[in-house]
Amino acid sequence: MRAAEERKGVVPAARRRDQFPVGMRVLAVDDDPVCLKVLETLLLRCQYHVTTTNQAAIALKMLRENRDMFDLVISDVHMPDMDGFKLLELVGLEMDLPVIMLSVNGETKTVLKGITHGACDYLLKPVRIEELRNIWQHVIRRKFSTRDRANLDFYEECNKPPNADSDHVHGHVTCGSPDQSGRPSKKRKEYCSEEEDEGEVNTQDIDDPSAPKKPRVVWSVELHRKFVAAVNQLGIDKAVPKRILELMNVEKLTRENVASHLQKYRLYLKRLSAVASQQVSIVAALGGRDPFLHMGGFEGLQGYQAFTSSAALSSFTPHGLLNSPRNNPAALGTQGVPASKSIQTMSGSHTLSHSINDANKYHLSLPGNQKGNLGQGLATSLGQTQMQQKWIHEETDDLSTILSGNGLSNGMSGTLQSVTSSPLLPQELAECTQAKIVSQPSIRTSSVSSEHIEGAVGVSSGLLESRVSQQSTIPLSGFSANGLLIHGSFNNTCANKLGGTSSSCAPARSSNDLMVARDTKGGASSFGGAMLLPPDTEQKYLNFGGGNGLKQKFDDRTADSLFDLKFVWSSVPSSQLASNIGAHHAMSQRWNNSSSNSSNIGARMIGQATSSGSTVIPQMKTDFLVSGDMAMPKNASDLSIPKLQSELSSSSCSFDGLLNSIVKVEKDDVTFSDDLGCGDFYSLGACI
C-alpha cells in the first residue's frame, strides 16, 4: 500500500507546473486511522496527491530519503511515538518544507506554540474541505520567500570583507564594490541577475525527474548535531562553509552540502525570530497570557525602595532643620516683615537630645507598610522619607547692647525664635501648626508701635502623647524684644508623675492673661515663663551677657531636692517684678530624680517691659548651691541677667512618644486670669 501511495506522487514536473495546484504532493501524518482516512479523502477531492502514514518516525524517514518527493506536510500534534512539534522542528530545519499542524486542541497556547515552532497554519479537527482547498498558497509563499532570502544572502556574501572567508575573495572581486551611496554597481547587478536566471534553470532541471541529479547527503540527527556544534563554536555570524566542514570532519561531505545546509539553518533561525517578534502582538490581541514570554515587573513593587543604611539617625543633626521659610529673612519679608530689618534667625549648638538605654523597645510609627526598629542599628533610612526632628536653635552670643530704653534704635537686634516645623513624617500624618511671623504693616526702628508679632514657640517632649502649640504675642512698644536663653533638664522616674506629657513653652504677652497650651489627654501639664522688664530700667542694667563666671547648679547629691510638678501661672504688677529678678550671672539648674535617661529641651523666654505686664512664674521648690565668691544683690535694679540656663530631661521619655507628640499636634488654649490662686511666689532666680 505504501508503494502504491508513493506512486501517486510520481507526476511529471511540467504537468504539475501547468495544472498547479492540481497534483500537489502532500504527506499526511496522524495516529488516528479514522481521522487519517477522512483527511486523505478530502485531499483527494481537492485533486492533491496524498501519501499517508500513522507514525511520525516513518514520515521523517520518508522525507530524509527523498525530500523532493513532497511539497507539503500535514501532521497531527499528539502522536505516541513522536510529538508533532518535534516533527515540525526537524522538518523545518532539515527539509524547509511548509508544515500544517492538525489537532483537536484549539487553545491559544497550543496554537501559539505551533506557530512559534514554525508551522505555517494550524487546523482544527474535523477539517473542512474549504480549508484544504487553500493550503496550496503556503507552498507558493514558501518558494517566493526562499528565493528572496537566497538573493539577500547572496548579496550579503558579496559585501563581506575579504578576510571573512578566503573562498569568497574571488566572488567579492567579481561582484565589484559599491559606490559611495552604498548602492551596488551595475556589474554586481548584472552578476546577480545572471545568478538568478541560472537558479531558475537549475530549479527546473531539478524538478524534472529525467534530468541527472547530484548525489545528496542525508542529514541525520548525529550529522546535524555536529553541524550545530560547529556553528555554535564559530558563531552564527562568522560561520562559513569551509570552516564548518573542517570542524565537522565528515567523509563524503562537500562544501556545497554544508553551504546549502547552512543557508537553510539560517533561514530557519530567521523564521523563528520573526515569529517570536509577532508573538507579543498575538497574545495582546487574544487577551491571554503566554508562559513562554518574558515575565514583566512585579505588580505593586515599582515604587518599592529598600531600606538603606546611613549614618545612625543622621537626620538628628543640630543644624539640619533651620531651613524653614519662616527662618529666612527673605521669607520674612514676604510675610510682612521687611527683610532689610535686623531680624536674625538663631543658630546654636543646643539641640534636642535623647539618650536611650534600651533601644529595642522603641519603634518608629511609619506610613504604609514601612517599619523600622531602633534596636536594629538606629540607622534605618526609610526609602524617600527622611526623618527630620524639631530643634530649638538658640543664640549663644552676648546679648549686650540689645535692649534700649529709647526704642529700636539699632533695629530689632533681639532675635525672634520660630520653631522649625520641618516634617518628621509625610504631611498627611503630620498636622503640625505652622508658626507665622506677621507685622502690620512693618517694624519701624524709631517709633513706638503697638503692632504684634505672633509666633509659635515651644518644644514638646512627649512621654505618652504630647501636644504643644504655644501662641505668644509680643507688643513692640519702646523696647526691642530680647530673648533670655533657658536650657533646662529634669529627670523623673515615672512618666505617670507628669501625666504622660511634659512640655516647655516660653510665651510673653503684654496683657494680664496668658494663653497656655495644655494637653487635655492624659493630664498633661506645661510649664514656662515670661519675664517682663520695667520701662524705667536703665540701659546699663540691661546689658546681658556679663563675663563673670558665677554659676548656680543644683547639687546632684542633694537627696531632699523637690520639684513640684504642678506649675502655677499668675500675674504680678511690673513694680513687683523688679524685686523678683534675682540672678546676676549665667546660672544653670538641674532637677534630677534618679534616672539616667534625659531629654534636653531648650526654649526661649522673650522679655518685654510694659506698664502693666503679666509675669509667668512656675511654682517650683528647688535648692541652689551658690558660689561664695559673690553675694547676691538685694536690689534688682543692680542686676544684669546675661543667661538663664536650665536643663530638662526625662528618664521615661520614650522615643515613640516623642514622635507621636510631634505628629499629633493639637492646640488647646487655656487662659489663666489674675484671680487664680497661685500659692507662694518665688524670686525669678528661684523659679527659672
From Swiss-Prot:
Protein name, per record: Two-component response regulator ORR23
NCBIfam families in the cross-refs: myb_SHAQKYF
Post-translational modification: Two-component system major event consists of a His-to-Asp phosphorelay between a sensor histidine kinase (HK) and a response regulator (RR). In plants, the His-to-Asp phosphorelay involves an additional intermediate named Histidine-containing phosphotransfer protein (HPt). This multistep phosphorelay consists of a His-Asp-His-Asp sequential transfer of a phosphate group between first a His and an Asp of the HK protein, followed by the transfer to a conserved His of the HPt protein and finally the transfer to an Asp in the receiver domain of the RR protein.
Subcellular location: Nucleus
Record-listed 4-aspartylphosphate modification sites: 76
Chain intervals for the UniProt region annotation (Disordered): 161-212
SMART domains per record: REC
DNA-binding residues (ranges): 211-270
GO cellular component entries: nucleus
Family membership: Belongs to the ARR family. Type-B subfamily.
Role summary: Transcriptional activator that binds specific DNA sequence. Functions as a response regulator involved in His-to-Asp phosphorelay signal transduction system. Phosphorylation of the Asp residue in the receiver domain activates the ability of the protein to promote the transcription of target genes. May directly activate some type-A response regulators in response to cytokinins.
Entries under PROSITE patterns matching the protein: HTH_MYB (PS51294), RESPONSE_REGULATORY (PS50110)
Upper classification of the organism: Eukaryota, Viridiplantae, Streptophyta, Embryophyta, Tracheophyta
InterPro entries: ARR-like (IPR045279), CheY-like_superfamily (IPR011006), Homeodomain-like_sf (IPR009057), Myb_dom (IPR017930), Myb_dom_plants (IPR006447), Response_reg_B-typ_pln (IPR017053), SANT/Myb (IPR001005), Sig_transdc_resp-reg_receiver (IPR001789)
